[in-house]
Amino acid sequence: KVTSGTLRYMNGNNTAQNIIVYGNITIDNGAVFDVNTSGTAANMLTIHGNLTNNGTFDMNTGTGRVCNVIFSGPANREINGTGTVTDFNTIEVNKGSSRNAILEVKSSALSLNTSLATALNLTNGTFRLTSPLVLNLTNAGSFTIPTSGCLSANGGTINIGGASATNATDLILDGRLEILSGNINVGTPGTNLNNDIEYSSGGTPEIIVAGGNLFVNGQIRRVTTINTGSLSYTQSNESSTVTIAGRNASNVRSMFEILNTGSKFNMSGGRLIISESFDNPSYIDLYLAPDSSTVTGGTIIFGSTETPSGIAFNAVSSVPLYNVEIDATTNSKTVDLRIYPLTIKNNLVINGNSVFRANGLNITIGGSLINSNSTSGQ
């Protein structure tokens, strides 16, 4: 515990120091735990307990003057406190051997070194942002969630991809991505970068959206070089929104796809928006052919204000959907049904002058057909 004064990594003789704390670290109001601003060293701090900062915690005081922090141990722990400076160079979460142990951020402030390609590394356990902060995890680098890891937003905003992002700045999903509330952004809205969620052919890739917002500037898809890979997708809560912008997309994969043995598509609430289309019947924008599915609510929306004029979406679903809506904001859109007949458990809503084309496939609607387009019916 630092009650007053300064506890400092000195960088003496440019030599790194490694400290392991098996209990908690507490920094009181007015106290400081930092790295010296002279000398250069990549120090290390391993914490098995909680980090409570009510003063100043600064592990990145300049180029080469850093302390990288590892949170370890199999128990749930927190980063909390009211200090205005809780500054990390990098954080590694290595808690236990599964995703069960949680490192939860509840502090008033927290920042990472945004000049690095990737500043948060998940090895084992869950990293959860509960504080209403904006946290940038990567700049140019991709971010990997391993099989035994979970990235979770519970009130804060997590960004993957910064000013130096490229098409390769993706979220590589082997484990779990979870949004309870708050936001997770993969890529920056408005950029023409294919920043994807790429789920692997191994591991147990899973997306859970129980509130808040998930934005993906590219696609949610398999690896482009092999056909294996199965995703478990669960969306609930009417306030939740998933937006797939589909920018600069790879046409060897759909904008949003769930298929193969072990895959799941479960939806009981919220909105799933596909903004962009390949606009080509040879390429499918929505491809749902999961191994299992439970659908009791939610709305799949084709198009948004970002969709170019005259676009046609191509949709495939072997499982029932609850609500389907075709957007007409700014301009009209067209949706073409492909391969399978479709069951819509509740409503099909066609806004403005948009068009839904069944292309000879049967459609069963359990609720209402709301067609605002009086000039076209196909």
What are these model-derived regions, one by one?
Residues 1-378:
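Extracellular beta-sheet-rich ligand-binding/adhesion modules
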